[in-house]
Structures are given as structure tokens and as C-alpha cells.
């Protein structure tokens, strides 16, 4: 049966932990393999990217494979050809599909009509590869995840949704602060709470950060929301992670950001460049986690 990674929930409890530990092993050993020798990965990217593209291309190369990168300008993706036809054709040529797009429904359609593993490299609804990589960044420092308190400050966006899913399996405490009207998916929250996730919501950033070991944020206007920038700047006033907010966290708290960051908006320059910032470790860990995820889907 073909395996896919379209959201963190696809893993299940045991596989989530197996992949996390495997990613750490791969990082510690600077892992290379021939898993993808003679194989190719098609990368369909409707959204521009630096870290996602380079980390995935490097991951595939380090596992012995080759990549083919395509944007909408270079394909029929989103044009006259139905996506289901694209899925069928690309499955005949390739062994793995890595997709960065807007709607989650496009990932689901590629899964339904394709015959090769599909990895969600980002949608508007989730960013599972990034959050699994962030879990590796935390796990390296605090292996007992049940004793960890993570704070999320900002938008109830795709990153927030994937953090909620991660809380289901890794059992850390997740305190989340959003402006009114910018909360995450309610159905996902209900699902997570029913599964026993320890998630607490507030509209007060200081309350969310109080005692946190890891303080997370993201841009206020994601790709495709540029026309809302001014409106969001007003709504998110008071949600900037600055020295005063970090002072409310645990004494050894770390700052996290998936990048790219808008310094002076969701985070100050001082916090971003401080010793507490672990954003570059997060960026590096994309490579190691994505190798582990590729291995997981390819081994069936």
C-alpha cells in the first residue's frame, strides 16, 4: 500500500515517534544512503520557496535520487489539464511527489489519482514537514517532550494547525495566543482535544508565553495574503515577540520561527538575533527530518 505524508496525523503515534528518532539518528550520523538510487522525485511548487526547495532537493540527493522541479509556469498544473490527469501521468515517470501548493484539496487529489507517495511540503491548511522538523529541534534539547511547554503567538495559520496536530502525538503542552478572529481550525482543535492533546487558547500573548520553554511565531500575513497586510498589522498589534514578552517565558526559553521572518513585525531584531534564538537549527533540521519522512513513505 502506498504511503503518503499529507499531514502529521498520517503518521499515527508510533510512526511519529519512529520518524522523530530516525531524523535525529540521520542528523547525528550525517546519513547518506542509496534508498533513492535510480529514482526521481517530482517537485510541484505553486508557492515560491527557499528552505523547502533546497532542503528537499538536498535530501533527495543525499538519499541517492534525482529531482525534477516544476512551477505552474513550467507545467499544466492549475491550467487546462485536470489535476487528476497530472497525477496519473507524473506517477508513470517518477517515484515520489513533493508538493507545495495552496489548497489541501490539491494534495488530496494527487493522492487519490496518483500511484506514488505524496509529501505535503506546505498548503494553506498545514505545514507538517516544518513542524516535524521543529519537533526535532525541541527533541534534541528536551527529549522528555511531556515536560515541555510550547507557546504559539500570532496567526491561526497553517503552522498553528500543524502544531496542534503535533500536540496529539508528542504530548507537550501547547499554549496558543491569537487575536480575535484569527483562531485556528475549530474542527482540528476539537479533534486534538478529544485525542487528549494539552492545548490552551487565549487572546493574551503574555498568558501564552508565561513559563514557556519554546516561544514560536510566524509572519502575520502568509503568502497569498499580502493584500491583508495593513489590516493584519492592526489586528496583531501587541503580538510582537520582544524582550518584554520573552522575559515572561522560562529562564532558558528559546525563540523559534519557521522563516522567513519579518523583523520588526512578529519579532524584534533583538530577539531574533539573541542567543535564545534557535531559528538556524530549525532551518537545518528541515534537511534531516525530510530525509526521515522520505524514507518512511518510500519503505511502504
Curated annotation (Swiss-Prot):
Binding residues annotated for L-ornithine, in chain numbering: 158, 218, 222-223
A matching Pfam family: OTCace_N
A GO molecular function held by the record: ornithine carbamoyltransferase activity
Catalytic reaction annotation: carbamoyl phosphate + L-ornithine = L-citrulline + phosphate + H(+)
Uppermost EC category: transferase
Subcellular location: Cytoplasm
Lineage per the UniProt record: Bacteria, Pseudomonadati, Thermodesulfobacteriota, Desulfovibrionia, Desulfovibrionales
Organism: Oleidesulfovibrio alaskensis (strain ATCC BAA-1058 / DSM 17464 / G20) (Desulfovibrio alaskensis)
Pathway info: Amino-acid biosynthesis; L-arginine biosynthesis; L-arginine from L-ornithine and carbamoyl phosphate: step 1/3
Protein name: Ornithine carbamoyltransferase
Gene3D superfamilies cross-referenced by the UniProt entry: Aspartate/ornithine carbamoyltransferase (3.40.50.1370)
EC numbers for this chain: 2.1.3.3
InterPro entries: Asp/Orn_carbamoyltranf_P-bd, Asp/Orn_carbamoylTrfase, Asp/Orn_carbamoylTrfase_sf, Asp_carbamoyltransf_Asp/Orn-bd, Orn/put_carbamltrans, OTCase_ArgI
Cellular component aspect of the GO annotation: cytoplasm
Broad class of the protein's primary localization: cytoplasm
Keywords assigned by UniProt, alphabetized: Amino-acid biosynthesis, Arginine biosynthesis, Cytoplasm, Transferase
Tree of life domain: Bacteria
GO BP annotations, alphabetical order: arginine biosynthetic process via ornithine; citrulline biosynthetic process; L-arginine biosynthetic process
Binding site for carbamoyl phosphate: 49-52, 76, 100, 127-130, 258-259, 286
Gene giving rise to this polypeptide: argF
Biological role stated in the UniProt entry: Reversibly catalyzes the transfer of the carbamoyl group from carbamoyl phosphate (CP) to the N(epsilon) atom of ornithine (ORN) to produce L-citrulline.
Family assignment from sequence similarity: Belongs to the aspartate/ornithine carbamoyltransferase superfamily. OTCase family.
Signal peptide stretch: none
